[in-house]
Amino acid sequence: MAEMRPGPLVGKQLNELPDHSPLLQPGLAELRRRVQEAGVPQTPQPLTDAFLLRFLRARDFDLDLAWRLMKNYYKWRAECPELSADLRPRSILGLLKAGYHGVLRSRDSTGSRVLIYRIAYWDPKVFTAYDVFRVSLITSELIVQEVETQRNGVKAIFDLEGWQVSHAFQITPSVAKKIAAVLTDSFPLKVRGIHLINEPVIFHAVFSMIKPFLTEKIKDRIHLHGNNYKSSMLQHFPDILPREYGGKEFSMEDICQEWTNFIMKSEDYLSSISETIQ
């Protein structure tokens, strides 16, 4: 029997329903059936409604796209244990304490979570590119539990001030491909925007290596702001940025410390999902 697929409007309407809505059950039942029949290797996370809804919402309840995303998620985790097998925060605590990463206190006007990464606080002699990417994966696994984030996705700001050749050497073609996989179709979060600021000339070689692995949709959502970025950034993120980037209410140090505390409080959960797929 031909399977009915919701059109864009229906999918977006389903996206706004609460987890307990009976209207979500047909999609949940079908996605669960596909996973069980395919015998896909399981992650440590059981096939609860909440877990399956991440994939359905990430693809606006298009079952075929959600199923493809889920298969890619399992495949990526199995093939990249150096990234996904150990999500315990103590492995990257030095990066967090250095102030490499923070999450803004408020969402943007579209409801997206906004994440900030500062390359100057990554010492490539101490932490590898895999360590750095694990920071992003840890945050992603935490915020993907939020229903509003499932609906409205994330936007990332990368401050590339301090980017050096030693950083570039860490981003091999293999690493670039793995990073691109998560940005495109291997993790159940909608990437709504990527904003690069203070990008030096030597960064463009690395960007050129990653770009071929990205979808056209993701490419269209990448914004290069350069060194004179404050006015353009404030247009994208009015009233929610830290002082270092044109805001007024709080500093990067504040939000880095707050997010580090939140990650450490989530250590038990992160440990529980850190086992490698069997």
Swiss-Prot record:
A 1,2-diacyl-sn-glycero-3-phospho-(1D-myo-inositol-3,4-bisphosphate) binds at D185, K190, V191, R192, K217, R221. PROSITE patterns: CRAL_TRIO. One of its GO terms (biological process) is positive regulation of amyloid-beta clearance. Monomer and homotetramer. Phosphatidylinositol 4,5-bisphosphate binding induces the formation of homotetramers. Phosphatidylinositol 3,4-bisphosphate is less efficient in inducing tetramerization. This is Alpha-tocopherol transfer protein. SMART domains: CRAL_TRIO_N (SM01100), SEC14 (SM00516). Residues 88-253 form the CRAL-TRIO domain. It is found in: Cytoplasm. Pfam families: CRAL_TRIO, CRAL_TRIO_N. Keywords: Cytoplasm, Lipid-binding, Transport. Disulfide bonds: none annotated. InterPro entries: CRAL-TRIO_dom, CRAL-TRIO_dom_sf, CRAL/TRIO_N_dom, CRAL/TRIO_N_dom_sf. (+)-alpha-tocopherol binds at F187. Signal peptide: none annotated. Binds (+)-alpha-tocopherol, enhances its transfer between separate membranes, and stimulates its release from liver cells. Binds both phosphatidylinositol 3,4-bisphosphate and phosphatidylinositol 4,5-bisphosphate; the resulting conformation change is important for the release of the bound alpha-tocopherol. A 1,2-diacyl-sn-glycero-3-phospho-(1D-myo-inositol-4,5-bisphosphate) binds at S208, M209, I210, K211. GO terms for molecular function: lipid transfer activity; phosphatidylinositol-3,4-bisphosphate binding; phosphatidylinositol-4,5-bisphosphate binding; vitamin E binding. One of its GO terms (cellular component) is cytoplasm.
